[in-house]
Each structure stands twice: as C-alpha cells, then as structure tokens.
Amino acid sequence: MRKAFLFLPVFLSAVAPAFGQTKAPQPSTTAKVPSVVPIKEIVDKGTVSGRKYTNDKLNFSLTLPAAWEIKPNNFADDMLRQGVDIRLKAPDNLRPGDQAKVNQSLRRVEVLLTASRARFDSYQNAILRVSAEDLKPNPQIKDAVDYFDAVRASYKSMKLPADFVYSDTKAEKLGRHEFAYLDIDSAAGKKRMYATVQNGFAVLFTLTYSSDDDLQSLRTILSDGNFKLK
C-alpha cells in the first residue's frame, strides 16, 4: 500500500479545484486525524523581485507577464480567513489511516509560488502553483518522465472520481529545457502539470485553466525561464 501514496502530493494538486474551494472546517469536539501538514520548510522558498521569481537552491528563475499577479506567501492563510481552505492536506473523504499516510507524504512538498491571471471576459481565473517535492526517499526517480510515470502508477492503484481523466506522460522542450507533463480533466477543471527535476527535487508547475491562452502563457513563461542558474 505504501507505493499507492508515494506521489499523492501531485494527486492532491491535480484533483483539487483551482482555489481548493473547500470550506474551512467547523470546530468539532470529535477527535480527528490532523488534516493539515505542520509548516516545515523543506527547501528554500526562493525570492520575488517585481515579477521575477528566483530559487538559487533549485537553480531556476522565471518571470511572469504583467497579466499575472504573484500572491504573497501568506495567501493560503488569507484565503482561510475568507472561508476557503487551499492548504496542503489529505482529502476529507479518505479513511483516517489513509489520511495519515497522505499527510506524511505531504511533508516532502513545499509550495514555492502561487500566481493568478484574471480574465476580463470570464469569471474563471487561471491559477499557477509552483511546488517542489523532495525525491530523496525515492532515488529510483531520475528525471521528470520517471516522476510522472510513478504518478500515473499511483493513479491506477486508486479509485478515482469517474470524471477524472489523465493523459499519458508526455515531454515538451520549452526554450532550452525539456519538461515532462500530464494533462488532467475533471470536475475541478482542466490542468496542465509540467515537471522537471532540480537538485533532487521534482519542481512542479501546475496550471488550472479554462482558456488555451492561459496555457500558452505558461508555456511562454517556462520557455523564457532559466533552469541552469549557477
């Protein structure tokens, strides 16, 4: 069963709606499995200067266009105060034992950057979340293709929602760097997940979108990014 939860951090980011759209939990006197992973930084979060994000520890930088708004690091806390919970945590519909396994796996994940692109012709925004997952417990993962192949294997081992459809692992060269990616369709919307492996971490760029223009914008962001910082 351990392998089924090996890459659930990616599963959670794929299944969750754009902003989580989960109401903040109400106080309860019933003992529950802790649902939120305690904050513990596993890798440097990087820095933001204007519209440029840089992570020296993971050797990459990227610049977001003016149409994108970079959210502050306390964005999840701000959303929680508004009644929307987007924190990394196990889904409520899992059994307590499975929730504990998922939350344990989430200890290897760090959200590095969250950004959104508002569309004036639609009520739907595009949401970009950049995250990193520590691969030290899984030395067999050598590159992003290996990573997404493992993700797909864990998908196959679980009972997913009927509307959850995911693609084969694919690769795309954007600029000077090659990424693996998955496409996902579900009730939560369309997602494109790009990944690369940097210094022992899987770095994920997860886009929730409705317009192909937003997807093209992400492709341009990655094409123009520098993934060989020294």
Please name every model-derived segment.
Residues 123-130:
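Acyl/amide activation-and-transfer machinery of modular secondary-metabolite enzymes
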Residues 18-116, 120-122, 136, 158-179, ...:
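N-terminal targeting sequences that direct proteins away from the cytosol to non-cytosolic compartments
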Residues 1-20:
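Sec-dependent N-terminal signal peptides
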Residues 130-161, 222:
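Long, charged/polar, surface-exposed segments that mediate recognition or autoinhibition
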